[in-house]
Amino acid sequence: MKKRIRSSYKVGSSNKYHKKNYTDNEKDKKKYRSYKEKHINEKMFDKKEFLNFLTNFNKKFMKKNSLVDHLMKMNDKAEDNYDGYNSSGSRYNNINDDGVELCGTKRYTNNKNNSDYDNYNNNNNMKNKRYSNKKHNNDNIIINNNNNKYTDERKYRNKSIKEDVDYTNDYYNIQLNNNKINNNQTKNKIDTIRNISHEKLGNNKSSSARNLSLIQTSHIPYDAPLADFLENGRFLRTFENISLIGQGGFGSVYKVSHRLEPGSPTYAVKFIYLKVSSLDNVSSRRYFREIAANRDIYSKHVVRYYTWWCEEPQFLPMHLMPKEIQNLVKKNKDTFKKRLTKNKKYSNNCISDSSNNNNSSCYSASSYNSSINSNYRNMKLWIKKKEQSPDMKRYKEVLRKNNAPNLVFYSDNDGLTSKNKENPEKNHNPFLSDKNFSDSIYKKKKSHDYNSSSHKLKKRKNKKKKSKKKRKSKSKIKTNAQGIYEESENDEGRDHFQYKKGKEQFSKFIGKLILWVLHKVSKNMILLIMVILSEEDRDLIVFADNEESNGNDQQMIRHDNMNNENVIIKHRNEDDKNGLDGDKNGLDGDKNGLDGDKNGLDGDKNELDDNKNELDDLLMKQKINSLTRNDIVNIENENPAPHATNNIKNKKVDLNGELTYYDYVGKNEVIPNSRTETNVESINTNGMFNNKFSVMKDEGGEYKKKENMTWGDTKRDGLYENGKHEKDGLGVNKCITNKYIENDDDDDDDDDDNNNNNNIDERKKDLKKKQKNAITKGNEDLLATNGTNNKEKRKKDDDINKNMEKIKSYKKKTPVPEFSIVLLLQMELCKGYTLRKWLDRSTRSDKPLHFTYSDKKMNHPLEFDLFKQLIKGLKDIHATCFIHRDLKPENIFVDNDTYTLKIGDLGLVRFIEEKKREKDFNNIDCYKDNIYTDINQNRITSQISIKGQIIGTPGYTAPEGGALCDEKADIYSAALILLELLCPRFTTIMERYKRLNDFRNYYTVPDYVKIHLNPWYILMLQMSKPNPADRPSAADVYSKIKVLLDPHLTDFAFSFNDIHNEHMNKPPQGTNNFERITDNKDKFVIQSVVDMKNKVENEEIPIEKGLNSNVENIKNENNGADK
């Protein structure tokens, strides 16, 4: 329970969500800091004791107390809602609901509720006695007797229930009997309660809306920062809705009357619908700019904002809310509505139809018993499933135990031949994939088979782990010369074979034999069997290194496509190498020839060219991971043979000596290797590969990989110890680089490694001398530049990776639940209408220079006076360091009676930051704005009011616009409003739009404005300059308007009767602030009164003497016209 509806804010910086004095209550707290909060402890306040006290008080004094009846109803509704029953009279439907409480499936009686019910009956008796003197004495006595009998029977039955052991059966039997006997009494009580409630709702709609007991509670957590801003129910308590004023992008505004203030004054309340998370601080939203600005602005020409608060939608009258919010509530899309449906599970079932069924009740024994039993059974089943279900973390082990005998070892041709495909039921697919990883696909065997196989699996796994630690490379079987099988490797390093040709019967026999042996013998003992078997049969042995394998990666490949497939060949030991046929012996001879003498390379190439057709079936394609201009080519092969170059057509080398790309024969696929090191073959002048080198660095007895190395980096690190730059027939530089590091073979290959290392050491000495002569100074410069370029690329890559990690972490943030709230702003109610309606009214003239005049004794037109008030309001707004940013006639209000102007709708208000403003405008080139072009696309519009809309209204915004605008943007908008005031009424919207657009782009105005209203035209040009720094401030404009509207210059004012004498019967006494000096009526010379006034002040001559001659001339020419 929340302690308070409205929480108070501590004054100080310690509070994280500190909000400055937005309301009157907080202003009082700021002044009088001695105010201390006192919270009511609800445990100390017992409702039952209070109700007992009131009933006893009524018994003694026998006086009518309406508060008692209201509290009794409130208490009944609260208890019914807590128990999950209907809030409208369900207490009286079930007779034994008060005496029995349900806790799961156990039921027990409570004596305290009996006393409460007796108190309620006593209260009813007292009520009946009150009205006994008036009417219906006999009826009341009968009802009282029935109630007394009912209470006695109920007490007796409750005592009998306590003595019984089986609570459930007695409870249901008693409930059935009570429903049969007292059904008529309960029906009468329900009908009376419903009738009374309907009468109240029909007579008093406002009272029902204000009854907070009918409204749901708040669903926002009380600990959330959002709860500090809530004042649920404040609108219904203090205001009464009258009518809708208007709706816009920021919300809807209603005219309301204040109930609590004397005279019930009227205000305007704006409703703004927000979707906010529980952790969001509402005061940081853009809507609160309007609140913060109006809190400090006290101006006659600015709409005042009094206070603000937040409420949840369910606490507000729904007819005031927009249709969007009403639809959300109806469709249960909001979070608070979902919780309401959970609390009202049984509300629909609790409503009893008394007119149709006489023997019905809220909960019949049969329906209630069936619902309880079904729920209880479901709970039992759920508990059993939970107990029987294994730990989900070990689900893989459970599946492996069930599928163990089918998945341990398998023959290579089982499930792959055409015969097996024809009979899928008999011969199932042995390969384990993600799709068929279930018990339904593999047939189960007996339980003892599962246990025995799973126990053996664990032992095998432990042995495999030990063997993997000892061995650095896994053992793999060489292919047969006849091409019966070929070995391939999938992405996870698992081994499988691909069937190629005949001998099906023999392979099945060998496969079954291996399965039987592997159940009995460990994996390491199979090496003995390999010695016994022949060379052809030795290839049929299959090692299942991992029980899991992807069936999608293991597919049949025919003999026709073998030349195009990638095969990895690794040498187990020297015995396997010598065991190959003549073709393989030829390869070993070629390798020994390369190790013995460097000069034998040419001869080896010729021999390999002769045997090219015979070796195509067993050749290996070199796999390349990355080919870049500055990086080394990575070839995923540990021991490549020199004859592998026959599959490569073209080998191109960059000018820097780097491998750029290769053209391969056949299909290119990168096969990842368990050993992650980069192996590169060096190139001879004739295009042959020399011995391999690995870009590795020996540190502490271990080799560490050097990735993305360039020639410059390898030269600097000393990795490339030897290299050649020679030219072929085309003049392309090719590099020979040789570096040898010990191969990672088994313990049996140590002798071969020592022999190879001796040969390597001899070659290093010879090639070092040649490398020094080959590298020139020009090549060294190229290597250095490449090294620096790679550093810059690495930095860029690192920055990109960091940014990607930040983006991923941002996307992975857990979403916070959002709640719907309504922000309410209490504002000053402006009488009249907007300036837009005032300008477009039908009584306004559509002819030039036909201005309006008020009833007051005013020397100038009303349009000029309204503009003066507008500039005064902007001056007050800018003085408090705020910018309106959305100044237009729609946001300006005019009173019909007093003709006072007020600026409203500060929803886009912004704080002025002078330091940022000066820096920003120095870097911006201002330009003219054209609505029809795409010039506005370059504007900075980071602070957007509505989705997809530029700040402010496009027709009145300044050219700079966006987030960098300052208070001079309001001056630009005021200049356009002045132009609209000087022009007559526009007949169409397009005419107004064209007039404003011409001024924005070309500064064009009508001729009568230039000639007859020249000072105002000059003022408009100054206010609408493209550079904001050149525009005058609001204070400067206000001072200039004062001079133009100076009442001392009325004697020399120009009258509109001189121009349009035939259209005006009575010329008004007004000013256009000009002096007309004419010799003839056809010639007009306009002279500014401002210049005349300055001359008079400088010469220190009175105005009457200085201009006496001019006045006399004007009077003579105009024949007694008004001054």
Swiss-Prot record:
Primary localization class, coarse: endoplasmic reticulum
Keyword annotations of the record: ATP-binding, Endoplasmic reticulum, Kinase, Membrane, Nucleotide-binding, Phosphoprotein, Protein synthesis inhibitor, Repeat, Serine/threonine-protein kinase, Transferase
Assembly description: May form oligomers in response to stress; oligomerization may result in catalytic activity. Interacts with BIP; the interaction is disrupted in response to stress.
Gene: PK4
Keyword Metal-binding recorded: no
Subcellular location: Endoplasmic reticulum membrane
Residue ranges, annotated region (Disordered): 1-30, 409-493, 572-609, 742-800
Pfam families: Pkinase
Bias (Basic residues) ranges: 455-477
Any Gene Ontology CC annotation: nucleus
Organism annotation: Plasmodium falciparum
Record carries keyword Nucleotide-binding: yes
Biased segments, Acidic residues type: 743-754
Broad class of enzyme this protein falls into: transferase
Sequence repeats mapped onto the chain: 576-582, 583-589, 590-596, 597-603, 604-610
Name of the protein this chain belongs to: Eukaryotic translation initiation factor 2-alpha kinase PK4
Description of post-translational modifications: Auto-phosphorylated.
Phylogenetic lineage: Eukaryota, Sar, Alveolata, Apicomplexa, Aconoidasida
